[in-house]
Design a protein with these regions (language model features):
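Generic structural signal for well-ordered alpha-helices
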Residues: 5-8, 62-66, 112, 162, ...
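Glycine-rich beta-alpha loop elements in corrinoid/cobalamin-binding modules
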Residues: 7-10, 19-141, 494-495, 501-532
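Conserved C-terminal portion of the radical SAM core fold
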Residues: 48-50, 76-78, 195-198, 202-212, ...
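Structural motif
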Residues: 52-54, 244-246, 429-440, 461-468, ...
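Active-site beta-loop-alpha junctions enriched in small/polar residues
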Residues: 54, 82, 165, 214-216, ...
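N-terminal [4Fe-4S]-dependent radical SAM core
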Residues: 116-163, 409-425
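Radical SAM [4Fe-4S] cluster-binding motif and immediate context
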Residues: 147-303, 309-311
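C-terminal accessory regions of radical SAM enzymes
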Residues: 330-333, 344-465, 469-472
Length: 532
């Protein structure tokens, strides 16, 4: 939503703005299935769609836009966001009319002007997209890039969460990150401008504000910002979340952060091996980082501390140091032990062959082996990290039972057809009443559902009133395993396993029957080994 707001403001402020009507973002954007979103798009009849692509939405976005173009042949498409880079593996087909690398605000008015004045014949012909680079445009001040403080688009979400950018640009030049490749200079809002935005968000119901600055304490007026936040949030009704550099943080600054009600601060450490840090351009003074994290803890700010694994030149000893580093804090911090991702446009991706990095071809581009660690070794590292720190969260504590917690919509049953399905949601539970005669339909229905909606989250629930052969359960697991992978599967599944996250199978036992505990345990183990 922040990207849409910035592009809206850029167009409204330009001479190109009067030529366009900006359609409101449909509420279905956050919760709709692909078909729901397609129906909304076709109903709105846009001339241009501008989409922000990230590693978690690019496959779905391209799939949806391809379908939209079949329904709206004259639709023009502009793609931007952190995923857009030259030689992107998913952007080889001529789907988009324009690709924007870097910040879209200085380029967007010119892009849509070009689309508007292009002759129809050239618009209708599918061709390679024109590439626009923000580095070739005059950079905007942040105050000129963001919507005005009182713009209606500046709203918290339904949960009271709002996002606010106060400083654009990062002092770090990390080889694994694409941020510094998109912008080299920095620009910021003045503290009083930020104060005005916080007050307005507060009046509009914000309870938590996440500052999206890549490094909040790199703001040139950092201490003045803290003093302002203390003043406008004296009653601490708003909680703030920030990302900072711990090695430059003083105790007094941490104290001021607490007074402003900054309750969480994310700190990236990544590695403590000097050789690794040199390759990824990540300078580190370990003692100063310790000092900064201790200051946060002393003032009751919970740090999220990030380390990475599968970095170039990283050996098992460095990984062990990283895990011990995180474990020593216990529950005082939120530890994150993250796989290295070869994001398009980053130095690490460009140097992958030279550095001996092998990664997934599709998002999230997770590194599968390095010059020093095999895939088997990385799988063992992931297992150790899960045992020490805990793995990815799962909303469903069990796969077999009379009560199954964490189901998306726990209602409705079907014998293999589409009853019991909430069609408009991007996360859906489909129930099947088991019987031997309808069992063949169940696998076919699962395949058909995922073929129709490959990007939403699916839970398939088999309701039973007797023990069923485990061969039947295994056959449905095979059906799901043969489906095209989802980006969440590629992110979460351990490297030495093929666990599925986006489509999962559950067994719900009728409340009136009692089944053999041994059968239940064996079935639970079977599903637990197949699904997250």
């Amino acid at each position: 939503m922040l990207a849409a707001a910035c592009l809206t403001a850029a167009l409204e402020r330009s001479s190109e703005g009067p030529h366009w009507t900006i359609l409101p973002t449909p509420p279905e954007q956050e919760t709709g299935s692909d078909q729901t979103l397609l129906n909304v798009i076709v109903h709105m009849q846009p001339e241009v769609i501008a989409a922000t692509c990230t590693l978690w939405n690019i496959e779905r976005t391209l799939h949806l836009l391809k379908r939209a173009r079949r329904e709206l042949p004259h639709l023009k498409v502009v793609l931007g966001g952190p995923e857009i880079a030259e030689q992107h593996p998913l952007l080889r087909l001529p789907l988009a009319d324009a690709l924007c690398i870097g910040e879209g605000e200085p380029l967007f008015p010119e892009i849509v002007r070009t689309l508007r004045v292009s002759p129809p014949s050239s618009r209708n012909k599918r061709r390679l997209a024109r590439l626009y680079r923000a580095s070739e445009a005059k950079p905007l001040r942040l105050a000129d890039a963001l919507p005005a403080p009182d713009h209606p688009i500046n709203q918290p979400d339904a949960f009271g969460m709002a996002y606010l950018e106060t400083n654009r640009g990062c002092p770090m030049k990390c080889a694994f990150c694409c941020y510094n490749l998109r912008r080299s200079a920095t620009t910021c809002l003045e503290p009083e401008d930020v104060a005005k935005r916080i007050r307005i968000l507060r009046k509009r119901g914000a309870k938590e504000i996440r500052l999206v600055d890549p490094t909040f304490n790199a703001h040139p007026h950092f201490e003045a910002m803290l003093k302002m936040m203390i003043r406008v949030n004296r009653d601490k009704k708003i909680a703030f979340f920030v990302e900072i550099r711990a090695d430059t943080l003083t105790d007094e600054q941490a104290k001021m952060m607490a007074q402003a009600n900054i309750t969480e601060a994310e700190v990236g450490v990544q590695s403590t091996d000097p050789k690794v840090l040199r390759i990824i351009h990540r300078p580190l003074n370990e003692q100063k980082v310790w000092r900064g994290i201790d200051a946060l803890l002393r003032h009751h700010i919970k740090p999220t501390v990030d380390f990475m694994y599968a970095l170039p030149a990283q050996d098992a000893q460095d990984v062990e140091r990283s895990l011990n580093w995180l474990a020593r804090f216990g529950d005082a911090i939120h530890p994150q032990f993250l796989p290295t991702l070869l994001l398009p446009g980053t130095e690490l991706r460009d140097r992958a062959k030279e550095l001996g990095l092998r990664a997934q071809a599709l998002p999230p581009y997770r590194v599968l082996s390095t010059d020093t660690l095999t895939s088997a070794q990385l799988a063992l590292i992931e297992q150790q990290a899960a045992e020490l720190l805990g793995g990815f969260d799962s909303p469903t504590p069990r796969f077999v039972g009379k009560r199954l917690e964490g189901l998306f919509n726990p209602r409705g049953r079907t014998t293999g057809r589409k009853a019991g399905r909430t069609e408009e949601k991007n996360r859906t539970t489909l129930y099947f009443d088991f019987s031997y005669e309808n069992f063949p339909k169940i696998g076919e229905t699962i395949k058909k559902c995922v073929a129709e909606e490959p990007h939403i989250l699916w839970q398939f629930v088999l309701t039973i009133n007797e023990e069923i052969p485990l061969d039947f359960v295994e056959s449905l697991i095979v059906v799901i395993r043969r489906l095209p992978s989802h980006w969440l599967d590629r992110l979460v599944s351990p490297l030495d396993q093929k666990k599925h996250v986006a489509r999962r199978l559950f067994i719900k036992i009728d409340n009136l029957v009692t089944l053999d505990p041994a059968w239940r345990a064996e079935t639970e183990n079977l599903l637990e080994n197949a699904f997250h």
